[in-house]
Amino acid sequence: IIVTDTGSTDRTKELASRYADKVLDFAWIDDFSAARNFCAQHASNNWILSLDCDEYVNSIDVKTMRILMQKFPRYTGVIRLKNLVLDEDGQTGYGTDDVTRFYNKNFYTFDYPIHEQVCSKDMAKREEMMQCFLLPMEVVHHGYALTPEEMQDKQRRNLSLLYKNLERNPDDSYTLFQIGQSEFILGNHEKAVTFYERGLAGDPSPEFIYVQVMIISLAKAYVKVGREKEALALMDRYAGRCRTAK
């Protein structure tokens, strides 16, 4: 177990040192991928399970994981993340996300400064779908159990990093998608439409999950700004290529 601390001011390091093999310091540079990759570099094994401090493992089948690692050495592992959320009345609920967090560091690395993604180290393969298996484990995430005010603050933080990355990569569809998501949550639906449209302008493959989400999100944003006909036209356009559009 390796814990990378990016500047905590509480007892995080003290508590982590009771359980971790290594507790490392990493100066925060507005880049979550850089912190994750720094941590992975110090691992003695090649297979990496990357978790955040607001996540915990609720259950795990290590025996099955080992079998999957041996059978599919170049695959990545997907966690079904159980997100703890608060509704408008402050009641607790759960949503789920499938996220790639298990990988062999010989072949894969994290990319993007925020909403970081496991990507192939071979740049020529970046546009290909990664092969993956579902990990036999449940991980609970507390990072979205926020009040509306806290959620808005988090989205503004996210946007500051996303816009910086967009300056470096102005046509990156994933970054454009994530900006659209944050603007939508903040209630800036016209802005969200603009960024979703830009994200789809390069015709990224709907085989990627984020593209499917972007299509549906754009349709919802169209409805929010009174452009229902365009929402229907969008669904028709992607019906044959995107299962969520059907």
Please give the residue ranges for each predicted region.
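A conserved acidic beta->alpha catalytic loop
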Residues: 5-14, 28, 52-55
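Conserved donor nucleotide-binding strand/loop of the catalytic core
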Residues: 14-38, 42
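Catalytic-site signature of metal-activated, phosphate-bearing donor transferases
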Residues: 34-40, 57-194
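Short aromatic/hydrophobic "clamp" motif used to bind/position activated sugar donors
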Residues: 48
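Flexible helix-coil transition and linker loops at the boundaries of alpha-helical arrays
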Residues: 165-169, 200-213, 241-246
